[in-house]
Amino acid sequence: MSQLFYKGEALLLPQTLHIRHLGQQDYQTVWHAMQAYTDNRGADSQDELWIVEHTPVFTQGQAGKSEHILNPGDIPVIQVDRGGQVTYHGPGQLVAYPLIDIKRAKLGVRQLVNHIEQSIIDMLSPYDIKAYAKTDAPGVYVDERKIASLGLRIRKGCSFHGLALNVDMDLAPFRRINPCGYAGLEMVQSKALNGPQSVVEAGDKLIDTFTKTLGYQEVIHHQGLAE
């Protein structure tokens, strides 16, 4: 985080968050891209938020146990390097990957998780959806049903992986797993709660609350991954 000095006092430069709109992508392409971005970051690298929908896939986090994958069928299962256990991604789900230099921002991992959860809660609140987080089970819930999942990885003081918000999707594949390691955990989506009706709508709302919660002063939008 760079500073200017004015009359001997340190002034914080406005922070910029770069938003990458990736459309629908297969999981591994985006996973490898965010690994590469994190590995190649320098002290002056910009923070980014990647917005994407994935083709159907189960991802198994580092804490995952095989017994929580009940019947994957024709949906691929990928072992990944994020925290947490197994979850499902598919069309109609908003996935957002915050690539944040948390060391530079002086953010702890728990603080970042809290900020992400609060961003989701705040975006749902105007729709009169009473969402909340749990201290013992990361994510966001509505009436004990899970609407958003979280799983992060920190490398070189920078975050990657992120959140998945159910918007307007087929929830049936969640029944092929124990979501996040919890047998019988019921999932819910925003469309059924009269919340955001599309991934585009949900993405726009999340970008707004995320930037406000994290304190970014400027947002720059990009289409697709960087060349």
From Swiss-Prot:
<dbReference type="InterPro" id="IPR004143">
    <property type="entry name" value="BPL_LPL_catalytic"/>
</dbReference>
<dbReference type="Pfam" id="PF21948">
    <property type="entry name" value="LplA-B_cat"/>
</dbReference>
<dbReference type="GO" id="GO:0005737">
    <property type="term" value="C:cytoplasm"/>
</dbReference>
<dbReference type="InterPro" id="IPR045864">
    <property type="entry name" value="aa-tRNA-synth_II/BPL/LPL"/>
</dbReference>
<dbReference type="GO" id="GO:0036211">
    <property type="term" value="P:protein modification process"/>
</dbReference>
<keyword id="KW-0963">Cytoplasm</keyword>
<feature type="binding site">
    <location>
        <begin position="82"/>
        <end position="89"/>
    </location>
    <ligand>
        <name>substrate</name>
    </ligand>
</feature>
<dbReference type="InterPro" id="IPR000544">
    <property type="entry name" value="Octanoyltransferase"/>
</dbReference>
<keyword id="KW-0808">Transferase</keyword>
<feature type="site" description="Lowers pKa of active site Cys">
    <location>
        <position position="146"/>
    </location>
</feature>
<feature type="domain" description="BPL/LPL catalytic">
    <location>
        <begin position="43"/>
        <end position="218"/>
    </location>
</feature>
<feature type="binding site">
    <location>
        <begin position="162"/>
        <end position="164"/>
    </location>
    <ligand>
        <name>substrate</name>
    </ligand>
</feature>
<dbReference type="InterPro" id="IPR020605">
    <property type="entry name" value="Octanoyltransferase_CS"/>
</dbReference>
<comment type="function">
    <text>Catalyzes the transfer of endogenously produced octanoic acid from octanoyl-acyl-carrier-protein onto the lipoyl domains of lipoate-dependent enzymes. Lipoyl-ACP can also act as a substrate although octanoyl-ACP is likely to be the physiological substrate.</text>
</comment>
<comment type="pathway">
    <text>Protein modification; protein lipoylation via endogenous pathway; protein N(6)-(lipoyl)lysine from octanoyl-[acyl-carrier-protein]: step 1/2.</text>
</comment>
<keyword id="KW-0012">Acyltransferase</keyword>
<feature type="active site" description="Acyl-thioester intermediate">
    <location>
        <position position="180"/>
    </location>
</feature>
<protein>
    <recommendedName>
        <fullName>Octanoyltransferase</fullName>
        <ecNumber>2.3.1.181</ecNumber>
    </recommendedName>
</protein>
<comment type="similarity">
    <text>Belongs to the LipB family.</text>
</comment>
<feature type="binding site">
    <location>
        <begin position="149"/>
        <end position="151"/>
    </location>
    <ligand>
        <name>substrate</name>
    </ligand>
</feature>
<dbReference type="GO" id="GO:0033819">
    <property type="term" value="F:lipoyl(octanoyl) transferase activity"/>
</dbReference>
